[in-house]
């Protein structure tokens, strides 16, 4: 290992020197260009652009080398892009930002990966140079310039100009051994950035319903992914804990529990309490007037009314926490009330910069590209959701100094959020080239009738009812399989919770979040197909293989350091490559925030493992006696590597596997 680190350090030093040299040359060219008298100025500008491209490429290589010294798992796709990027640059140095397309091959006959850049380069040469060159000829030229590397066994040119890449078996074997010795390491991300995720966000005094399920599950999983990748993550729960509805709630509290300041009111069912207060607000004029007075006193921070507000919030908070505990979700509460004192400054800042118009007493802000303005102050002087969302955005950017902001909110809020983001950019709070702000939108949950998921009476489904139903059905499923006869009561309880909550989460996460999805307990608890039930059962079977061979974790760790993982059988080779695709899967999700890609990968990994296990004996037994005759340790190591990746995948998805099911 020390020799490899020394070699990497030497390569880093050489690259740093070249980068310094190139930087100096670029500065020289800049200065020369500024004279404005050179007849070959255009040529110098072209050369400058090429040098910048080369500089960027070297800096990326430098980052890759640095990542290798800290044991991050190699992203094979990125490594191949680096290699082919160097080959294309060497073959066609005159091209600026040539296309770089490397993907896993879909069929074994096309190798392990494919580089399909030749077609794009053909078009560029025809368009910019008026050169007609066949993609195959370009592919041949690229392959001749592939630098010496540790991972490519051979390349072949197929069809019109596809470059089929075959990986070296010793390279794949070493990466698998490294995975087992060092554990699952995150992909290299360079500079550590701060990520702020806004998710879940229920309303105080209302119960969480099935509509909150998606935001909560998706947001939690995104947080886990960014945390694993090494980002500084702030998980925010933007609670609806302020507004006019608190006036009627406080007025009703005063009537029902007049001594609430000294005796904690026994509000058992906050939903019923809310409905009672709403009915009175709609039907009793005197109560309605008192409710408005309560709002004014609350907003003026009257201590008695703040106490009433806190009591109501606490009841809700405890109910929310029961659900968060079930789903293993962690959040930092920062509701609308947190931003109330910032509203005045938001209005003033937009006024000072000349963005505010007055319309029927309202203060509004038009944002270029959006037809509906933001209302930042109502005609009665009150603030709006627009004001509070702008205040939250400003605080996250300027006070929290977030580099990446992600709002996990339903698709129906898309136009509103995009308008708020654009307003923040317009006023100068952030530059989208520097700060990434994304609305991670999602569709609605449908019932099996393909309509919005409701109870038989037409009410919204309470989230706690849904989770309890999941627990009941999971236990029924386990008892149908007679697991209650082989598991201890503690193991059975753990399996029940793993299956129930794992299946509910996976059913959501395995669908593209942009689409609506049909909620079906029968489908999600099916142990066939791409479900959590199938993956959890597969995981327990994999973990049992070494245990049944009397091989413990210590023995496997020792074997990982000493034994070579043989990949001669086609199913061993297929499984080994599939395991090592994990870093590129994670990188893709960090880019597009589509978590179903991870679910698809885990299902592919489980089915690839099944193919391997059906064709390659890990433990060979005597057919008559059942006595173990031979243990193929390298295959047990492949089992362990598969389970290790699956466990990390489950962790990112928020699913808790069990050793026995």
Curated annotation (Swiss-Prot):
Residues 530-544 are annotated as: Interaction with tRNA. It holds the Pfam family tRNA-synt_1d. Residues 1-72 are annotated as: Could be involved in the assembly of the multisynthetase complex. A motif ('HIGH' region) lies at residues 202-213. L-arginine binds at residues 201-203, 212, 385, 389, 413. PROSITE patterns: AA_TRNA_LIGASE_I. GO terms for molecular function: arginine-tRNA ligase activity; ATP binding. The alpha-helical N-terminus (residues 1-72) mediates interaction with AIMP1 and thereby contributes to the assembly of the multisynthetase complex. NCBIfam families: argS (TIGR00456). Belongs to the class-I aminoacyl-tRNA synthetase family. Forms part of a macromolecular complex that catalyzes the attachment of specific amino acids to cognate tRNAs during protein synthesis. This is Arginine--tRNA ligase, cytoplasmic. The gene is RARS1.
């Amino acid at each position: 290992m020390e020799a490899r680190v020394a070699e990497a350090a030497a390569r880093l030093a050489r690259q740093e020197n070249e980068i310094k040299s190139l930087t100096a040359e670029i500065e020289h060219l800049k200065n020369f260009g500024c004279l404005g008298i050179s007849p070959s100025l255009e040529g110098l500008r072209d050369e400058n652009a090429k040098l910048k491209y080369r500089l960027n490429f070297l800096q990326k290589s430098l980052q890759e080398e640095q990542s290798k010294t800290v044991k991050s798992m190699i992203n094979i796709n990125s490594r191949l892009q680096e290699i082919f990027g160097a080959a294309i640059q060497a073959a066609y140095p005159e091209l600026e930002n040539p296309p770089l397309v490397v993907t896993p091959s879909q069929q074994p006959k096309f190798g392990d990966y494919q580089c399909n850049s030749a077609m794009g380069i053909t078009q560029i040469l025809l368009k910019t140079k008026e050169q007609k060159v066949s993609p195959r000829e370009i592919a041949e030229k690229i392959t001749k310039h592939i630098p010496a590397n540790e991972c490519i066994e051979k390349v072949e040119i197929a069809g019109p100009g596809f470059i089929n890449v075959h990986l070296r078996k010793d390279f794949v074997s070493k990466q698998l051994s490294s995975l087992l010795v060092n554990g699952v390491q995150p992909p290299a991300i360079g500079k550590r950035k701060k990520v702020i995720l806004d998710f879940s966000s229920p309303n105080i005094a209302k119960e969480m319903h099935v509509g909150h399920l998606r935001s909560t599950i998706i947001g939690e999983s995104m947080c886990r992914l960014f945390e694993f990748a090494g980002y500084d993550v702030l998980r925010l729960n933007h609670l609806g804990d302020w507004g006019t509805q608190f006036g009627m709630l406080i007025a009703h509290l005063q009537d029902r529990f007049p001594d609430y300041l000294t005796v904690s009111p026994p509000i058992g069912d906050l939903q019923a309490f809310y409905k009672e207060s709403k009915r009175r607000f709609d039907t009793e004029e005197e109560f309605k007037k008192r409710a408005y007075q309560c709002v004014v006193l609350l907003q003026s921070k009257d201590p008695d009314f703040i106490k009433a507000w806190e009591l109501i919030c606490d009841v809700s908070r405890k109910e929310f926490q029961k659900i968060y505990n079930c789903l293993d979700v962690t959040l930092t509460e920062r509701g609308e009330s947190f931003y109330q004192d910032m509203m005045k400054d938001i209005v003033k800042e937009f006024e000072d910069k000349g963005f505010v118009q007055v319309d029927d007493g309202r203060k509004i802000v038009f944002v270029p590209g959006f037809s509906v303005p933001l209302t930042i102050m109502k005609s009665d002087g009150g603030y709006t959701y627009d004001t509070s969302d702008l205040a939250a955005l400003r605080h996250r950017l300027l006070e929290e100094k977030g580099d990446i902001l992600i709002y996990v909110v339903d698709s129906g809020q898309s136009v509103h959020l995009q308008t708020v983001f654009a307003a923040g950019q317009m006023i100068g709070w952030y530059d989208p080239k520097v700060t990434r702000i994304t609305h991670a939108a999602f569709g609605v949950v449908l019932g099996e009738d393909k309509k919005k998921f409701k109870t038989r009476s037409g009410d919204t489904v309470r989230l706690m009812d849904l989770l309890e139903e999941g627990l009941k059905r999971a236990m029924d499923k386990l008892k149908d399989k007679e697991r209650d006869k082989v598991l201890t009561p503690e193991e059975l309880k753990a399996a029940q919770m793993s299956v129930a909550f794992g299946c509910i989460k996976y059913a959501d996460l395995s669908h593209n979040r942009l689409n609506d999805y049909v909620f079906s307990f029968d489908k999600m608890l099916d142990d066939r197909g791409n479900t959590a039930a199938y993956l959890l059962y597969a995981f327990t079977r994999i973990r049992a293989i070494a245990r049944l061979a009397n091989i413990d974790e210590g023995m496997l760790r020792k074997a990982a350091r000493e034994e070579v993982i043989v990949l001669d059988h086609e199913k061993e080779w297929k499984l080994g490559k599939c395991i090592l695709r994990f870093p590129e899967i994670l990188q893709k999700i960090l880019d597009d925030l589509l978590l179903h890609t991870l679910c698809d990968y885990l299902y592919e990994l489980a089915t690839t493992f099944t193919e391997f296990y059906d064709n390659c004996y890990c433990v060979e037994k005597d057919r008559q006696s059942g006595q173990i005759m031979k243990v193929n340790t390298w295959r047990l190591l492949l089992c362990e590597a598969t389970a290790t990746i699956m466990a990390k995948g489950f962790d990112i998805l928020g699913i808790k596997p069990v050793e026995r099911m």
